[in-house]
Structure formats: C-alpha cells, structure tokens
UniProtKB/Swiss-Prot annotation:
GO MF annotation list: thyroxine 5'-deiodinase activity
Enzymatic reactions: 3,3',5-triiodo-L-thyronine + iodide + A + H(+) = L-thyroxine + AH2
Active site: 126
Entry keywords, A to Z: Endoplasmic reticulum, Membrane, Oxidoreductase, Selenocysteine, Thyroid hormones biosynthesis, Transmembrane, Transmembrane helix
Top-level taxon of the source organism: Eukaryota
Task of the protein: Responsible for the deiodination of T4 (3,5,3',5'-tetraiodothyronine) into T3 (3,5,3'-triiodothyronine) and of T3 into T2 (3,3'-diiodothyronine).
Regions annotated as coiled coil: none
Protein name (database record): Type I iodothyronine deiodinase
Length: 248
C-alpha cells in the first residue's frame, strides 16, 4: 500500500496543479476572448456529459468553472482523497454506512459469499451521476443474477450553498444525518433498483474509497476487484458492464 499511497499523493498534486492552471487559463481567456473560453468549456463539458444532458444549458454551469466556489470545492475533494485506502487487489475498507431506516451497518454486510458487489457513490446534485442513473439501473437489471449492487449517497457535489449549477436539484450541503437521508430519499424516488445507504457525517466511507464527487467499485470476497476513475470523467458504468460480462 505504501507505493500506492505515494502514487496517490503525486497524482493528486499533479491534478491540483492542472486544475489551477486550467482555472487561470479560462479566466484569462474569458477576459480576452469569451467565445474561445466557451469553446474550451464546452469541449470539457462534452467529456463529462454536461453538454449531452438535456436538463442544462451552458449558461447553467459553464461560467462556474471560473469561480472561487469551483476552486474551493475541487480542492476539498482532492484533499479528502488523500485518505483513500481502497486499491485494486487490496482489502476493501469495511467502513460504516447508514440505511434509509437509520440503522448503522457497514459495507461488508452487503457482501454475499463470492458474489461481486458493485458500489456506486454519488449525490443528486452531481449531474453526470444522475444522467447515468438509467445506465446504472440497466446494469442492475442485466447482472442481478450474478452480482449485488449498492448505492452510497455522499456529500453533495453541487449543493445550492456551494459550487452550484442553475436548474439543478435544490439541495444544500448536509449539516446533519437527517439532511443526508432526506437528500438520499430524492434519489430513492428515482428507483435505482438496489439498496441505497448514506455515508456517515464524518464522510469516512467517502474518504477511504476516494469517492468524491462520484465513483464506481466492484468488491468480491472482501477485496477490491475493480476501481473506476474519479468522477465525473471516470464514472463509467460501461466499464463495470464489461467487467461483469467477463464473469457472468
């Protein structure tokens, strides 16, 4: 795990520098050539499904990538990711979660024998997570005979009182477990076809899995079998499908 941690620290440092560089470039471009800045942002938006999402227009989200709220939120996500302990081939962190009935449990309770367990971390205010919910639901339908699925609701990616997008779900960042359960209930209404639990307010599970703002994992027999990239770029249900097809 030592080498994996070193790689994690170095990659996070590189990502932080990249984020700052991109931010400064966009701010400068916006000042001298707003049309060119928009072109760059739309290209980025295509990679994270924002331009494909019918819920949003460019004006709802594009300019927020040049805001201090973006820097603050993205930096916080990177800082928390340094506590990541879930690595492919290693032990899956058995961290605590809370059911929708307010019962404390843990990740391992959802592992059944040698069946794979797909974990999907996310929140309603994360547009790519919600945009790909139907794709995730199709995974549940197609592979429920060989695998189990669990959605873990975590801190809001784009809370109304944080890095907010217009026309998004109106949910403030959670100040209590009741807030988080209430937000998760919004997701439950979309019928994800599998159990939904929430992370504790310490965000311990989110941190150990490096899950902000969204992420996919496959666990089996207490080990990490598959670890998707960090969202929004790395949240890819198609990769999970390919992985499960090999073991079906």
């Amino acid at each position: 795990m030592f080498l994996q941690k070193i790689v994690l620290y170095l990659s996070t440092a590189c990502m932080f520098c990249y984020m700052l560089g991109k931010f400064l470039m966009l701010v400068i471009l916006q000042f001298f050539s707003p049309s060119l800045a928009k072109k760059f942002i739309l290209r980025m938006g295509e990679k994270i499904t924002m331009t494909q999402n019918p819920r949003f227009n460019y004006e709802d989200w594009g300019l927020t990538f040049m805001s201090l709220a973006f820097i603050k939120t993205a930096s916080s996500h990177m800082w928390l990711s340094l506590g990541e302990e879930a690595f492919v081939g290693g032990e899956a962190p058995d961290s605590p979660v809370v059911t929708m009935d307010r019962e404390k449990t843990s990740i391992s309770k959802y592992l059944k024998g040698n069946r794979p367990l797909v974990l999907s971390f996310g929140s309603c205010t994360u547009p790519p997570f919600m945009y790909k919910l139907d794709e995730f639901k199709q995974l549940v339908k197609d592979f429920s005979d060989v695998a189990d699925f669990l959605v873990i609701y975590i801190a809001e990616a784009h809370s109304t009182d944080g890095w907010a997008f217009k026309n998004n779900y109106d949910i403030n960042q959670h100040q209590s477990l009741e807030d988080r359960l209430s937000a998760a209930q919004v997701l439950v209404q979309s019928e994800p076809l599998c159990p939904v639990v929430v992370d504790e307010m310490t965000d311990v599970t989110t941190i150990k899995y490096g899950a902000l703002p969204e992420r996919l994992f496959i666990l089996q027999a207490g080990k990490v079998l598959y670890k998707g990239g960090k969202g929004p770029w790395g949240y890819n249900p198609a990769e999970v499908r390919s992985f499960l097809e090999k073991i079906k």
